[in-house]
């Protein structure tokens, strides 16, 4: 029997002990990171975390469900109907779950605790930098989507409060979409985004969970007991072409992308074992699948091909139950934007410190000035783009391709490199099978990323 071992030499796997380079996803790179000592628990140590298995399932579900939910009915319409939408999600689920398991396996092998750290350690510097850039761009695009969602929900709420029909001309200046988004962003989002640390994640998580489940329940109820004034458009039963099916990929990738936050969750478990983690992510993805399918199917069948990219915009403004759903979504997004910005800012800060060769131990004044400048630039750019891109579907079509990188490409590369690092005399069939699967993941991810990004640029953005 060939002896199989994984190179666990931390000095060879790790890239650097610099905090800017190894910044935790939800921690500023400027904060000192205590190096792992010999007495510190490793990811495989049963005492390394406090999260139960059930708690891990809940956290992964919470990380998965989000703003992409509102775009799923339109994705079913794009895919060509209920059958195509279900088949696409079921087919994707296998790769989504396997990617999460691969990341946990590589986290144990490399002794790293965040997504970008795992990629850095397993795949090397170049791939690690690309991963960090992808995370920064992805969080930037998601922040734009959040601002668009705020505008979508405010339009409907303001229409009721001002007692004006949807799309009425000659509205007062203070009800203009650009003004309301800007006012909300400056009053609430910017002050929450500037601090160095964020302590409201638990409230944001609670709001996200409540809001997501409430929106799903309302969409299902409105399908079962529809309002008399709602008339569905054409109900597609088959895709116009096979390319139409792939055009729904960005929404599905964006909706199910929880891979970036999955590695810290895995390492926070009481028993971070790959087998246990496989059960956790399978249960979590089945729950997320049920929510997304319920929303997608019922929302699509309610409005048909006429469904809006933001499904809540398809409902009448006067509907009280839907208005409550809009309020939940706004509150959730107001607290989620600063968290996503914080993740992106941490990555940008790490890239900047490494590029400049700056030491982590800097005076507080320089760090504060740089943080405020980064926050203002990030905030103003996302706000400006959100004001002139009123369709959430156009944003998701772009960042959905990046989500495919986190689901397919980086886990595939990690699997290939992890298997290549094993010191074996004879390669068994399972070794070749796993390497081949890694190649399949990378190939499939590259195809989805290329196809969806090209389609987003030439069809959605330039249309």
Curated annotation (Swiss-Prot):
* One protein family per Pfam: Aa_trans
Task: List where this protein forms a coiled coil.
Answer: none
Please give the Gene Ontology molecular function terms for this protein: L-asparagine:sodium symporter activity; L-glutamine:sodium symporter activity
Which terms are listed as keywords in the entry?
Answer: Amino-acid transport, Cell projection, Ion transport, Lysosome, Membrane, Phosphoprotein, Sodium, Sodium transport, Transmembrane, Transmembrane helix, Transport
InterPro entries documented for this protein: AA_transpt_TM
The family database entries (Gene3D superfamilies) matched by this protein are listed as:
Amino acid/polyamine transporter I
Q: Record's Gene Ontology CC terms?
A: axon; lysosomal membrane; neuronal cell body
Expressed, tissue-wise, as follows:
Highly expressed in the brain, including the hippocampus, especially in the granular layer of dentate gyrus cells and the pyramidal cell layer of the hippocampus, amygdala, thalamus, hypothalamus, in the layer of Purkinje cells in the cerebellum and the layers of cortex. Particularly strong expression in neurons of the ventromedial hypothalamus, basolateral amygdala, ventral tegmental area, and locus coeruleus. Not detected in glial cells, including astrocytes. In addition to brain, also expressed in the spinal cord (at protein level).
Can you tell me where the transmembrane regions are?
56-76, 82-102, 130-150, 179-199, 206-226, 240-260, 283-303, 320-340, 372-392, 396-416, 429-449
Q: Name one GO biological process term.
A: asparagine transport
Q: Where in the cell is it found?
A: Lysosome membrane; Cell projection, Axon
What reactions does this protein catalyze?
A: L-glutamine(in) + Na(+)(in) = L-glutamine(out) + Na(+)(out); L-asparagine(in) + Na(+)(in) = L-asparagine(out) + Na(+)(out)
**What is the membrane topology here?**
Multi-pass membrane protein
Q: Which residues carry this modification: Phosphoserine?
A: 28
Q: What function does the entry list?
A: Symporter that selectively cotransports sodium ions and amino acids, such as L-glutamine and L-asparagine from the lysosome into the cytoplasm and may participates in mTORC1 activation. The transport activity requires an acidic lysosomal lumen.
What family is it from? Answer: Belongs to the amino acid/polyamine transporter 2 family.
Give the PANTHER family listed for this entry.
Answer: AMINO ACID TRANSPORTER (PTHR22950), SODIUM-COUPLED NEUTRAL AMINO ACID TRANSPORTER 7 (PTHR22950:SF192)
Under the subunit heading, UniProt states: Interacts with the mTORC1 complex; this interaction mediates the recruitment of mTORC1 to the lysosome and its subsequent activation.
Q: What is this protein called?
A: Sodium-coupled neutral amino acid transporter 7
What is the species of this protein?
A: Mus musculus (Mouse)
């Amino acid at each position: 029997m060939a002896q199989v071992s994984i190179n666990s030499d931390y000095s060879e796997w790790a890239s650097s002990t610099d905090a800017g380079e190894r910044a935790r996803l939800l921690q500023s790179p400027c904060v000192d990171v205590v190096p792992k000592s010999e007495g510190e628990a490793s990811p495989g140590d049963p005492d390394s975390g406090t999260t139960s298995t059930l708690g891990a399932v809940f956290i992964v579900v919470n990380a998965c469900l989000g703003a992409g939910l509102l775009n799923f009915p339109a994705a079913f319409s794009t895919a060509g109907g209920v059958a195509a939408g279900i088949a696409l999600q079921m087919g994707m689920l296998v790769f989504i779950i396997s990617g999460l398991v691969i990341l946990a396996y590589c986290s144990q092998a490399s002794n790293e605790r965040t997504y970008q750290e795992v990629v850095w350690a397993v795949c090397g510097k170049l791939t690690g930098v690309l991963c960090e850039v992808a995370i920064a761009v992805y969080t930037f695009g998601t922040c734009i989507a959040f601002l668009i969602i705020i505008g979508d929900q405010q339009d409907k709420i303001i229409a009721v409060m001002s007692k004006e029909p949807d799309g009425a001309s000659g509205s007062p200046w203070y009800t203009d979409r650009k003004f309301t988004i800007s006012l909300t962003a400056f009053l609430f989002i910017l002050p929450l985004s500037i601090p160095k640390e964020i302590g409201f994640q638990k409230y944001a998580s609670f709001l996200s969970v409540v809001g997501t489940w409430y929106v799903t329940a309302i969409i299902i109820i409105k399908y079962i007991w529809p309002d008399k004034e709602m008339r569905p458009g054409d109900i597609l039963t088959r895709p116009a072409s096979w390319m139409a099916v792939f055009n729904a990929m960005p929404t599905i990738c964006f909706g199910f992308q929880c891979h970036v936050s999955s590695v810290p969750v895995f390492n926070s478990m009481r028993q971070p074992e790959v087998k246990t983690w496989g059960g956790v992510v399978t249960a979590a993805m089945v729950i997320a699948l049920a929510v997304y399918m319920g929303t997608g199917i019922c929302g699509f069948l309610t409005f048909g091909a006429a469904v809006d990219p933001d499904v809540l915009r398809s409902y009448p403004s006067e509907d009280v139950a839907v208005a409550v759903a809009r309020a939940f979504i706004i509150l959730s997004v107001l607290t989620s934007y600063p968290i996503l910005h914080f993740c992106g800012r941490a990555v940008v800060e790490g890239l900047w410190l490494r590029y400049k060769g700056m030491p982590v131990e800097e005076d507080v004044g320089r760090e504060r000035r740089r943080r405020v400048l980064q926050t203002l630039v990030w905030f103003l750019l996302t706000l400006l783009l959100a004001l002139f891109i009123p369709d959430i579907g156009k944003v998701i079509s772009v960042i959905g391709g990046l989500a495919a990188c986190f689901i397919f490409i980086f886990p595939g590369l990690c699997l290939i490199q992890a298997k290549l690092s094993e010191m074996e005399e004879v390669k068994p069939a399972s070794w070749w099978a796993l390497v081949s699967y890694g190649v399949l993941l990378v190939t499939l991810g590259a195809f989805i990323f290329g196809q969806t990004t090209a389609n987003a640029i030439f069809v959605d953005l330039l249309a």
